[in-house]
């Protein structure tokens, strides 16, 4: 049985949706290469994302992200976990939409809050009102996620394996 709907799998969604964890499991199961765009950006910069935001601002980070997304989406047979804000740049949306299957991993605000509340490595979440910030980011980005996605999957209350299996069933045309 071959995967007919995909040459690349791109995971989008908010911080804390499970893109990196599910992406690794999916790549392993499908025997594809896995990339996390944020990790690639950090490797190339020799610094973590918080440092990039501190020194270059969000604009500098988004420039780096755009370059990495353009490069990675030109590869074949990969699973790519993207950063939560990847969708705000039109060039990123075009690259993702034109070069693979875009899967939106959805999660509730409550689940997102639980998964990110102790995370000090996410510069956009360093705020007193984390829930308010998550809601604001959702309101800004969700229309882009919905528009860009070929399909979406809920991640709340499901194991990593269950979500990965649901995605695989979709890719094989079993859903």
Swiss-Prot record:
Q: What is this protein called?
A: Shikimate kinase
Role of this protein: Catalyzes the specific phosphorylation of the 3-hydroxyl group of shikimic acid using ATP as a cosubstrate.
The note on cofactor binding and number reads:
Binds 1 Mg(2+) ion per subunit.
Question: Kind of enzyme, top EC level?
Answer: transferase
Key word NAD present? no
The residues that the entry says bind ATP are: 16-21, 122
- Reading the lineage from the top rank, the first entry is Bacteria
What species was this sequence derived from? Legionella pneumophila subsp. pneumophila (strain Philadelphia 1 / ATCC 33152 / DSM 7513)
Primary location recorded for the protein, binned into one broad class: cytoplasm
């Amino acid at each position: 049985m071959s995967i007919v709907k995909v040459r690349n799998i791109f995971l989008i969604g908010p911080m804390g949706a499970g893109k990196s964890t599910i992406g690794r499991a999916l790549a392993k199961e499908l025997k594809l290469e896995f990339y996390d765009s944020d990790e690639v950006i950090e490797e190339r910069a020799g610094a973590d994302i918080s440092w990039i935001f501190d020194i270059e601002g969000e604009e500098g980070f988004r420039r780096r992200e755009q370059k990495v997304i353009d490069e990675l989406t030109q590869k074949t047979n990969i699973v790519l976990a993207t950063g939560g804000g990847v969708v705000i740049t039109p060039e990123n949306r075009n690259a993702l939409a034109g070069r693979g299957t875009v899967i939106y991993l959805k999660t509730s605000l409550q689940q997102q809050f639980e998964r990110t509340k102790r995370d000090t490595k996410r510069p956009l979440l360093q705020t007193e009102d984390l829930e308010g910030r998550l809601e604001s980011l959702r309101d800004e980005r969700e229309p882009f996620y919905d528009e860009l996605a070929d399909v979406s999957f809920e991640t709340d209350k499901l194991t990593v394996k269950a979500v990965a299996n649901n995605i695989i069933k979709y890719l094989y045309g079993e859903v």
